[in-house]
Amino acid sequence: MTGDAGALVLFSGGQDSATCLAWALDRFETVETVGFDYGQRHRVELECRDDFRARIVELNPAWAARLGPDHKLDLSVLGQVSETALTRDAEIALRADGLPNTFVPGRNLLFFTLAAALASRRELRHLVGGMCETDYSGYPDCRDDTLKSLQVTLNLGIGSRSVVHTPLMWLDKAQTWGLAKILGGEKLVDLIRTGTHTCYRGDHDRLQDWGYGCGTCPACELRMKGWQEHRSSLDE
């Protein structure tokens, strides 16, 4: 366990950040969470956050002792400066530059900047996010180089010694499910399966084998593929 100060987890209510929350609870003495309301089309993920926080502490008494307050920040300004399929009712497609139109420019940069400011006030040294390069859509602000550079910038600009952790950076979705199993067994896997939301279209009515979602958007396809590979690996 890491003992120097605590951690602030960027917790959206999705699979990746939920796994990162468990990862942080397993390592730090104090863990707080922060979520961002930026007018996302799949805002149902925000509605999953409180219930997930309440249920994850039931899995481990030590985690219950470590989980601290939750913070939710209004970032509706993101919807004013960008027009994407995550903030507009638009069909998901590739842009002319090859990026999907679900990319919200600057989103993670803004998330981490505000999280670092909040963490400084809360005296939390460690920032934890669920970004990864392995199963991703080419988002520039999910890259390892971007986040390492951002850590330097945040420390220079805020005068802190924050550490940015991205425990999923080199994991694919199957390995992310596997990490959840290592951290909390099948109970945590099932909690993430049923208690988080990933679908870009905000479909939280249909419970699939791998969780809620439409099953056809890029986020659902990645989650479904990872789930199938994870379960297949258990049968080998």
Swiss-Prot record:
It is an enzyme of class 6 (ligase). Pathway: Purine metabolism; 7-cyano-7-deazaguanine biosynthesis. CDD domains: QueC-like (cd01995). Zn(2+) binds at C199, C214, C217, C220. The keyword Repeat does not apply. GO terms for molecular function: ATP binding; ligase activity, forming carbon-nitrogen bonds; zinc ion binding. ATP binds at F11, S12, G13, G14, Q15, D16, S17, A18, T19, C20, L21. Binds 1 zinc ion per subunit. Keywords: ATP-binding, Ligase, Metal-binding, Nucleotide-binding, Queuosine biosynthesis, Zinc. NCBIfam families: 7-cyano-7-deazaguanine synthase QueC (TIGR00364). Belongs to the QueC family. Catalyzes the ATP-dependent conversion of 7-carboxy-7-deazaguanine (CDG) to 7-cyano-7-deazaguanine (preQ(0)). PANTHER family: 7-CYANO-7-DEAZAGUANINE SYNTHASE. This is 7-cyano-7-deazaguanine synthase 2. The gene is queC2.
